[in-house]
Regions:
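Extreme N-terminal starter segment of soluble prokaryotic enzymes
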Residues: 2-9
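Phosphate-coordination/substrate-recognition cap region in phosphate-metabolizing enzymes
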Residues: 3, 44-126
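Short coil/turn segments at beta-strand junctions that form active-site/ligand-binding loops
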Residues: 6, 51-53, 166-172
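Histidine-centered catalytic micro-motifs
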Residues: 10-16, 176
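Loop-to-helix element that buttresses phosphate recognition and phosphoryl-transfer chemistry
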Residues: 15-70, 145-154
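Glycine-rich, flexible loop/turn motifs
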Residues: 20-23, 28, 86, 94, ...
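Active-site-adjacent alpha-helix immediately C-terminal to a catalytic or transition-state-stabilizing loop
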Residues: 64, 72, 155-176
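Short glycine/proline- and acidic residue-enriched helix-loop micro-motifs
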Residues: 113-149
Length: 176
């Protein structure tokens, strides 16, 4: 297998209603606020002059809207518009039982048994991976993704990019 160098631009969506309300959202499909739409347009303006060979995003509306706005601006600047691949492998972490719950309540439930008061305390004491593992432990149904489950899914998403036969060495891709 030939090794290729691809340039990947990672873009996060702007503010959603769940963000505004301090609610956990991973797989929940909370729409972008007006501020979030403005953030998408700012990202679009900054990326408009980059020629993208491919574009990928999660299958959530917030990611798709952000991606479409960036690709619209890119196309308006004279670039060929790549097809947008929306796939669940690019979703954010799944919070299981805690999806849509107030963040302070969820992170207290996850960190409390480990002597951590909140998300930042968990990260400081145990590292980022522990945030996923502790939340899965605290989920009464254990549906929330563990760190291992999360990375296994995301790696499958990166495999979709790597397996794209149209990409060549040096191409630039966009991931929302």
């Amino acid at each position: 297998m030939e090794t290729m160098l691809l340039h990947l631009h990672l873009v996060r969506h702007g503010q959603t209603f769940f963000n505004r309300y301090n609610r956990l959202q991973g797989w929940s499909n909370s729409p972008l606020t007006d501020a979030g739409l403005a953030d998408a347009d700012k990202a679009a303006a900054k990326l408009r002059d980059i020629e993208f060979a491919a574009a990928y995003c999660s299958d959530t509306t917030r990611a798709q809207v952000t991606a479409q706005r960036i690709l619209d601006a890119n196309e308006a600047a004279g670039h060929v518009r790549p097809s947008l691949v929306s796939d669940m492998h690019f979703r954010e972490q799944f919070y299981g039982y805690f999806e849509g719950q107030d963040m302070s309540v969820a992170w207290t439930a996850a960190g409390g048994p480990h002597g951590a008061k909140n998300y930042n305390d968990i990260v400081r004491k145990y590292g980022l991976a522990a945030t996923r593992d502790f939340l899965k432990e605290a989920d009464p149904f254990h549906d929330a993704e563990s760190d291992n489950e999360y990375w296994h899914r995301v790696e499958d998403g990166f495999a979709l990019i790597a397996d794209n036969p149209r990409l060549k060495d040096g191409d630039v891709e966009l991931l929302y």
